[in-house]
Structure formats: structure tokens, C-alpha cells
From Swiss-Prot:
Residues 234-251 have a biased composition (Basic and acidic residues). The keyword Transcription regulation applies. InterPro entries: HD, Homeodomain-like_sf, KN_HD, POX_dom, TALE_homeobox. Residues 391-453 bind DNA. Keywords: DNA-binding, Homeobox, Nucleus, Transcription, Transcription regulation. It comes from the Eukaryota. This is Homeobox protein BEL1 homolog. The gene is BEL1. It comes from Arabidopsis thaliana.
Length: 611
């Protein structure tokens, strides 16, 4: 009846497997009588059912029957007597104990093994490199040889026991085949996780080192694995350090706009650096122009707003915008200036060196700075174009660029060509020479260049002076303006304005004073003439050089000479009638004769004005 219920639950798909298993179990009795073949049949039975989760135990420790197995047999054999059931549990040689993984269907098997084959234990290993060496042994079913001496059971009891065993095996097959696919997928998933796990290789190494469970690897393979691990660790560390450095550089560039990561400018050529610098300078000029345009537009907008609102009304609104935009433009300017400085350093123009030179060097001029820059550019050109001096031409003296720099300094300080210690140090640094070489060059230059030039200049000056002495007619003999403007207290004008100041002088002294005061010798004519030569009274006449056409004398000023009694040279107004100062007016017209008294009043002041 239980067998009919079992077949009611199974489908047509498992009928073939059931027939095969029935045939195998029916041949079980034959294998018991032939002990040499029972091992082969046992492998066939439990090899086909190894995936069903069956565990078969042949240990000698299980001589005592399990109570669950006895209860199960008691449930299926209720019609049998107590004596028959006990005889089945104790004396049956073909019964088997079958224990499922889930402990659902326990059964009894023979608890004795053949004496000629010892039992083997269970060996586990996590190694995946050499699975054949893992000593995991499958359980085998080895029924005990029938002891024909003490066996007295009948055929019916054996047939019932065989049917019972067959029924349990088929039920186990049907139960585990339904879940076969799910278990297979779950097993593959866990196998993939174990294979790809990073703990697999350390576990294998530990097992091979301490347990030696079938993992046989050569020392070379172990060393290769360790070397690969070290390389991976180094690569990971390098990646971490580079990642952290990139993050730090990004933070620094975000905080400060002027600081930036300088590109490898040394790999660029000289012409590319020049183009880069020119482009950056043009961008800086464009930035300044746009910033000025923005400020102009803001000023216009603020003026329009203030015209509508009032003075100071736009400052509240434009201050924030102006501050933000000025910050933006300043950041851009700092970035461009940083790029220009980096490019200039790549070109060899070191601003720090130039600044130190400008502070220390007292005689440096813009011309020398330009010369230094030109020499640096020429040097870079030579380095790029590989234009070197010919090896077969020996170098005589100092290098040409050094001599050019020293000569330029000499001409800049021509009046005092004696460099100080600081100047020598700077020139030695610029030219690449030593201080002794710079000093020796200046000593030789002062003798060979500077001294001949000074002597030539002195010779030219002396030659011009000799030409002036030998040819006086070629020289302009006009008096100097200072000599004409000079006014002394002993001059004629002072005597006329102050007639009593010089009353005590004699005639000789008066005559010499007049001659010394009015020096008209430069005009080429005799300025002072005595009236005694042309007139009976001997008056003094002063000819001013205004000649008439007929060759006679011009305008003359007649002064009465001093009397023998020591009288005065000039008389007062009360004595004018006795000895007046007479003016000859040979060149005066009739109209001018009428104005003669006014001229008499003016006296010598007119003469001073004419002069």
C-alpha cells in the first residue's frame, strides 16, 4: 500500500531510474554470496546516489542500533510480530543503515566490514590548485558477508526487507531531484565567490605551510607569487600618493589664484617660449583694456543713476559690483603674471638676479641691462642652434661677449673708469670671468684705450687755442655783455650824477680815471681826444665813432680841462657861463639845436644809455 502511494507521487520521468535502481538492489543478494564483486556493485549504487545527499557509515562504533531507525521499522512493519522484528534488527545480513543529511529516512546497514580492508578517515582541504591530491574519500557500502552458520531467516523476511530498502532509496531520489537545479546553482555561486576571494591565496599558503594537505608548489612559484604581491602593493601605494598630491595641488590652486602648477617649460624650444610670452603679454594688455572699459561703463551708469537720484546714491549699489569684478580681474592678472614669470625664467631672464644687480651695482644703466639681456638671448640661440666655435681655431684672449660687457661698462664710466670691488664682482658674474681677470682687463684698457683717447682730446683743445692766437682777425672782438652792463662807482655816469664826489683829484688822476673807466679801445678808434689839438681852449672831446660822410669829426663832447691852480673838473651851475661844457653839434640839424639845453641837463646819462 505504501508503495502504491509512492508511485502515485512520482511522475513518468523517474520511471527509468527506478527500474535501474530496482535491478541493482535485486542483484544485491547475489553480490553477497560473491564477495569479490560486492565492492563493484556498491560503487554503482552509491555512485549514482552520491548527489542525493546520502551519507553511509560503516564505522564499527555504531554497533548499537539507533532508536529512530527501530521506530521507523516498527511503523512500516506493524503486522509483523515482536520476535520477527527483533530478529530482523539483529540478524539481517542484507539490511543497510541509510542516513539522510536531513535525518528524514534512517535505515540500517550491516555494522561490520571485511577484515581485509581497513577504514579510511575524512580529509578536508581548501586548496584549489591540486584537487587530485586532496584525500577526500567517498563512503562506500560494504555489506557484511553472510554468516551462513548462524543464519536461519526465511526468504519472505529477506524479500520484505529488500522491498523496504528499495522504496526508501526511490523516495530519496525523488525528493532530492526536485531541488537539484537550485542546489547546483547555489553551489556554483559559492564556488565562484571562493575562487575570486582575496583570502583564498593566504589560506592556501597557511594550509600548505602548517598542514601540508596535498598542496605541492615549487619554491619558484611561491617566490613569483610573493613578488607579484609586492609589485601590486607598490603600485597601490604610488597611486595613493599621487592621488593625495593631486588633491593637495587642486586645493592650493583653488585657494590662491597666483600660485599654480607650472608646466614643463624646459621641454619647449626657444621660439615657442618667445611666442608663448608674447601671447601672454598680449592677453595681459587685453585684460587691462577690458578692465578700463568696464570701469568706464560703471562710471557712466553711476553718473546716470546719480542724475536721477542724487549725488552718492549709486555708490551703495556699485561698490559691491566693483569690488567683485576687480577681484575677478585681479585673479586673472595674477594668473597671467605668474605664467609670464615662469616663461621668463625658462628663457633665462631671472628677475631676482636683475634686482640684486640693480641694488648692488651703482653704475648700472639701462643700456647695460639691455646689453646683458641681448647677450643672454644670444647665448640661448647658440645653445639651441648648436653654433659653437670651430675647434681648430684657438681662442685668444677673453671671450667676445665678456669683452663687450667690460667695454660697455668702461664707456659708461668714462670720466672715472675705476670699478670698485662690488662692480668687479658683478661684472665677473655677468661675464663668467674671475675678479683678477676683470681687474687685469681694466688695467690694460685704461692704458690702451682710455689714455690714448684722453691724449687725443687734449691735443685737439691745444690746437684750437694756437689757432686763435695766430689768427686774431678770425676772432670776433665784440665786447662781452657783462663788460658792457658793468657799472662802477668811478664811471662817467657816477661822476656826472655826483659832481662833488671827485673834487679833490688832480688833472692826471682825472684823465686816467676817465680813460680807465671808458675802455673804448675795442672799437679800433681813439675814444678820448683832447680839445687842445683842435680848439683854442683845450677841451676834452669824446668821439663815439659816428663818422660823417665828408670824413670830419662826429658828435663830440668837449670838457674843459683842469686849471693850473687846481680847480675842479666840473663847475657848478653858477660857473656854467664862465666855463661851460660845450657840445659840438656838427651833425645836429636846426631842429635838434633847439633841444640842446635838454641834452645839457641829461649830461653823461645819455652817453651811458647809448652805450
Amino acid at each position: 500500500m505504501a508503495r502504491d502511494q509512492f508511485y502515485g507521487h512520482n511522475n513518468h520521468h523517474h520511471q527509468e531510474q527506478q527500474h535501474q535502481m530496482i535491478n541493482q538492489i535485486q542483484g544485491f543478494d547475489e553480490t553477497n554470496q560473491n564477495p569479490t564483486d560486492h565492492h563493484h556493485y556498491n560503487h554503482q549504487i552509491f555512485g549514482s546516489n552520491s548527489n542525493m545527499g546520502m551519507m553511509i557509515d560503516f564505522s564499527k562504533q555504531q554497533q548499537i542500533r539507533m532508536t529512530s531507525g527501530s521506530d521507523h521499522h516498527h511503523h512500516h512493519h506493524q503486522t509483523s510480530g515482536g520476535t520477527d522484528q527483533n530478529q530482523l534488527l539483529e540478524d539481517s545480513s542484507s539490511a543497510m543503515r541509510l542516513c539522510n543529511v536531513n535525518n528524514d529516512f534512517p535505515s540500517e546497514v550491516n555494522d561490520e566490514r571485511p577484515p581485509q580492508r581497513p577504514s579510511q578517515g575524512l580529509s578536508l582541504s581548501l586548496s584549489s590548485s591540486n584537487p587530485t591530491s586532496i584525500s577526500l574519500q567517498s563512503f562506500e557500502l560494504r555489506p557484511q558477508q553472510q554468516q551462513q552458520q548462524g543464519y536461519s531467516g526465511n526468504k519472505s523476511t529477506q524479500h520484505q526487507n529488500l522491498q523496504h530498502t528499495q522504496m526508501m532509496m526511490m523516495m530519496m531520489n525523488s525528493h532530492h531531484q526536485n531541488n537539484n537545479n537550485n542546489n547546483h546553482q547555489h553551489h556554483n555561486h559559492h564556488q565562484f565567490q571562493i575562487g575570486s576571494s582575496k583570502y583564498l591565496s593566504p589560506a592556501q599558503e597557511l594550509l600548505s605551510e602548517f598542514c601540508s594537505l596535498g598542496v605541492k608548489e615549487s619554491d619558484e612559484e611561491v617566490m613569483m607569487m610573493k613578488h607579484k604581491k609586492k609589485q601590486k602593493g607598490k603600485q597601490q601605494e604610488e597611486w595613493d600618493t599621487s592621488h593625495h598630491s593631486n588633491n593637495d595641488q587642486h586645493d592650493q590652486s583653488a585657494t590662491t589664484s597666483s600660485k599654480k602648477h607650472v608646466p614643463p617649460l624646459h621641454s619647449l624650444e626657444f621660439m615657442e617660449l618667445q611666442k608663448r610670452k608674447a601671447k601672454l603679454l598680449s592677453m595681459l594688455e587685453e585684460l587691462k583694456r577690458r578692465y578700463g572699459h568696464y570701469r568706464e561703463q560703471m562710471r557712466v551708469a553711476a553718473a546716470a543713476f546719480e542724475a536721477a537720484v542724487g549725488l552718492g546714491g549709486a555708490e551703495i549699489y556699485t561698490a559691491l559690483a566693483s569690488r567683485a569684478m576687480s577681484r575677478h580681474f585681479r585673479c586673472l592678472k595674477d594668473g597671467l603674471v605668474g605664467q609670464i614669470q615662469a616663461t621668463s625664467q625658462a628663457l633665462g631672464e631671472r628677475e631676482e638676479d636683475n634686482r640684486a644687480v640693480s641694488i648692488a651695482a651703482r653704475g648700472e644703466t639701462p643700456r647695460l641691462r639691455l646689453l646683458d639681456q641681448a647677450l643672454r638671448q644670444q647665448k640661448s640661440y647658440r645653445q639651441m642652434t648648436l653654433v659653437d666655435a670651430h675647434p681648430w681655431r684657438p681662442q685668444r684672449g677673453l671671450p667676445e661677449r665678456a669683452v663687450t660687457t667690460l667695454r660697455a661698462w668702461l664707456f659708461e664710466h668714462f670720466l672715472h673708469p675705476y670699478p670698485s670691488d662690488v662692480d668687479k664682482h658683478i661684472l665677473a658674474r655677468q661675464t663668467g670671468l674671475s675678479r683678477s681677470q676683470v681687474s687685469n682687463w681694466f688695467i690694460n684698457a685704461r692704458v690702451r684705450l682710455w689714455k690714448p683717447m684722453i691724449e687725443e682730446m687734449y691735443c685737439e683743445e691745444t690746437r684750437s687755442e694756437q689757432m686763435e692766437i695766430t689768427n686774431p682777425m678770425m676772432i670776433d672782438t665784440k665786447p662781452d655783455p657783462d663788460q658792457l652792463i658793468r657799472v662802477e662807482p668811478e664811471s662817467l655816469s657816477s661822476i656826472v650824477t655826483n659832481p662833488t664826489s671827485k673834487s679833490g683829484h688832480n688833472s692826471t688822476h682825472g684823465t686816467m680815471s676817465l680813460g680807465s673807466t671808458f675802455d673804448f679801445s675795442l672799437y679800433g678808434n681813439q675814444a678820448v681826444t683832447y680839445a687842445g689839438e683842435g680848439g683854442p681852449r683845450g677841451d676834452v672831446s669824446l668821439t663815439l665813432g659816428l663818422q660823417r660822410n665828408d670824413g670830419n669829426g662826429g658828435v663830440s663832447l668837449a670838457l674843459s680841462p683842469v686849471t693850473a691852480q687846481g680847480g675842479q673838473l666840473f663847475y657848478g651851475r653858477d660857473h656854467i657861463e664862465e666855463g661851460p661844457v660845450q657840445y659840438s653839434a656838427s651833425m645836429l640839424d636846426d631842429d635838434q639845436v633847439q633841444n640842446l639845453p635838454y641834452r645839457n641837463l641829461m649830461g653823461a646819462q645819455l652817453l651811458h644809455d647809448i652805450v
